[in-house]
UniProtKB/Swiss-Prot annotation:
Function statement: One of the primary rRNA binding proteins, it binds directly near the 3'-end of the 23S rRNA, where it nucleates assembly of the 50S subunit.
Subunit structure: Part of the 50S ribosomal subunit. Forms a cluster with proteins L14 and L24e.
Chain coiled-coil ranges: none
A biological process from GO: translation
Name listed for the protein in its UniProt record: Large ribosomal subunit protein uL3
The species this protein was found in: Natronomonas pharaonis (strain ATCC 35678 / DSM 2160 / CIP 103997 / JCM 8858 / NBRC 14720 / NCIMB 2260 / Gabara)
Keywords recorded for this protein, A-Z: Ribonucleoprotein, Ribosomal protein, RNA-binding, rRNA-binding
Gene Ontology terms, MF aspect: rRNA binding; structural constituent of ribosome
Amino acid sequence: MPQPSRPRKGSMGFSPRSRAASEVPRFNSWPDDEGQPGLQGFAGYKAGMSHVVAINDEPNSPREGQEETVPVTVVETPPMRAVAVRAYEDTPYGKRPLTEVWTDEVHEDLERSLSVPEEQSGDIEGDIRTALDEGALADVRVITHTVPGALSSVPKKEPDVMETRVGGGSLSDRVDFALDLVDDGGEHTVTDVFRAGEYTDVAGITKGKGTQGPVKRWGVQKRKGKHARQGWRRRIGNLGPWNPSRVRSTVPQQGQTGYHQRTELNKRLIDLGDDDVSPDGGFVNYGEVDGPYALVKGSVPGPDKRLVRFRPAVRPGDQPRLDPEVRYVSTASNQG
């Protein structure tokens, strides 16, 4: 059998593999929600991994109704704050911000991240409702931020600011929900947005590995035999043909590895709670989880202490039952 061709591993769809512009991941699309108006996103800080014993509730599964061990990632999810409402309009170049309304009372640490508007001139809230009546309003989003200063395990006070879409109901209902949320102080929790058992999409910035060669970066084979004895075992054989006289972007070369934004689809929320979930001695490189948390089935991108964002799944498959039965959460220490 001939040797199959494998010039590299990995999708070219992720190229160029450069460092992420920000540690706060972004969502470029949002699901269409036909339920009640509400926020379509939340964020937390990755603490580490553990495992739980839960009842398999997947319909038509051979193990339905039986106990099984599930690996989970623990994400600490302290309450977030909504500080502004941003309205969008349709233009020939896509959606563009129309105007935004800021709350008068913001958290004291928010000025570490951005310059907070001191005062706003005119009736901006009235402008949003006027645009709604005229049919010029296309979408409503809320500017939210985390409060990492309230966590003992995240060594920073600078909030992470992000934009979250308001979904569900009519456009008028979404405007009312967003304005009421900001007027009421803007504080909201993960249980206000999600429910245990839902499928979510998780976005994060992966662990950075610096500059790496083509073997680690692209998974190419090391040279063998006489080619390796030339002195370069971990280099590629050539950069391409004489013509066209340029190096193509498909050639696997050394470069930045890791610290990329990645979004993983259909991650199930196993549990949302605030009970003791920390292992004996705390999570390695993180510490104790003192407040609300989310247990996500499987792994999520990024190292410990890094921000991860959630949104409702944009491509949900067959949704299992909500509120899965968790019988045991491991708090055993792996450090002895």
